[in-house]
Amino acid sequence: MSLTDDQASKRQAYRAAKEANRKELKHVKIDDALPNKSSELDLPKKKFYRQRAHSNPFSDHQLEYPLSPAEMDWSKLYPHYYDAATNTMTKKVTVADIGCGYGGLMVELSRELPENLILGMEIRVQVTNYVEDRIIALRTNHAAQKEYQNINVLRGNAMKFLPNFFEKSQLEKMFFCFPDPHFKQRKHKARIITNTLLSEYAYVLKEGGVIYTITDVLDLHNWMVEHLNMHPLFDRLGDEWLDQDPCVRIMRHATEEGKKVARKQGDKFVACFRRLPNPELV
């Protein structure tokens, strides 16, 4: 459905105002209420950030990425954890939400995992902008409690550039929530779980780290389980573990896509796999 001129004008004005606010506050260390700002920032409205549900991961999206993890400047994303005296970060990112969508999982994980830095990677421009604006508002509105300092988002293509951001064995958890199912067989190569990509995930995951997957598409669930089962560096975790892990509970209910599935009374298929030790060379 096309927008009227008035609707398009309102969307443009809203986005321009949010962009100005984003440029001002995106990299600011928000520890206390900011001067010259109202005490509360409105959370962004999704209707002004509409974009296609999925994006072609093989397209040239003109993304910015570091040549290596050593060249990544994390201080811009997590200024609260940057030590200016030593010019170093006091923590590293250890949790990644791949294809984070509108950021619902990260927001909930922020309180569940307060000692972890959590990064969402999202390829769509407007969705990334929404999450940035959401985090800015949450940080500002909870400045006194210093909450939500441990989450952020960047626009990136995890299928191409993941090792450019993360060192070997850096991550403890990776989440793949309701990824694009790519139903057509000729599109299966674009799925986020493949043999080749699993080897990259194994590289950035520490031993004992966990891959979390959830989807409402049974065919995709079976595909992900099959490929993870076949990979020598991953072992599936049982139902008892799933029932006890708080991140699984959050993953089921916190994401925007998960809430939509729940409203439609659809199924949610969950599978988690632990990163095994590297085999000893003989």
From Swiss-Prot:
Q: Where is the composition biased (Basic and acidic residues)?
A: 16-31
Question: CDD domains annotated for this entry?
Answer: AdoMet_MTases
What residues make up the catalytic site?
D180
Name the Enzyme Commission number(s) assigned to this protein.
2.1.1.33
The residues that the entry says bind S-adenosyl-L-methionine are G99, E122, I123, N157, A158, C177, T255, E256, E257
Q: Which InterPro entries match?
A: SAM-dependent_MTases_sf (IPR029063), Trm8_euk (IPR025763), tRNA_(Gua-N-7)_MeTrfase_Trmb (IPR003358)
Q: Which GO terms describe its cellular component?
A: nucleus; tRNA (m7G46) methyltransferase complex; tRNA methyltransferase complex
At the top of the EC hierarchy, this enzyme's class is: transferase
Query: Does this entry carry the keyword Cell membrane?
Result: no
Classify the main location.
nucleus
Q: Where in the cell is it found?
A: Nucleus
Catalysed reaction(s)? guanosine(46) in tRNA + S-adenosyl-L-methionine = N(7)-methylguanosine(46) in tRNA + S-adenosyl-L-homocysteine
Pfam families on file: Methyltransf_4
A single GO molecular-function term is: tRNA binding
Q: Which domain of life, per UniProt? A: Eukaryota
Extract the ranges annotated as region (Disordered): 1-31
| PANTHER family according to UniProt | 3-DEOXY-D-MANNO-OCTULOSONIC-ACID TRANSFERASE/TRNA GUANINE-N 7 - -METHYLTRANSFERASE (PTHR23417), TRNA (GUANINE-N(7)-)-METHYLTRANSFERASE (PTHR23417:SF16)
Q: Which family does it belong to?
A: Belongs to the class I-like SAM-binding methyltransferase superfamily. TrmB family.
HAMAP family listed in its UniProt record: tRNA_methyltr_TrmB_euk (MF_03055)
Say what the protein does: Catalyzes the formation of N(7)-methylguanine at position 46 (m7G46) in tRNA.
**Name recorded for this polypeptide:** tRNA (guanine-N(7)-)-methyltransferase
| Organism annotation | Eremothecium gossypii (strain ATCC 10895 / CBS 109.51 / FGSC 9923 / NRRL Y-1056) (Yeast)
High-level lineage: Eukaryota, Fungi, Dikarya, Ascomycota, Saccharomycotina
Gene behind this protein: TRM8
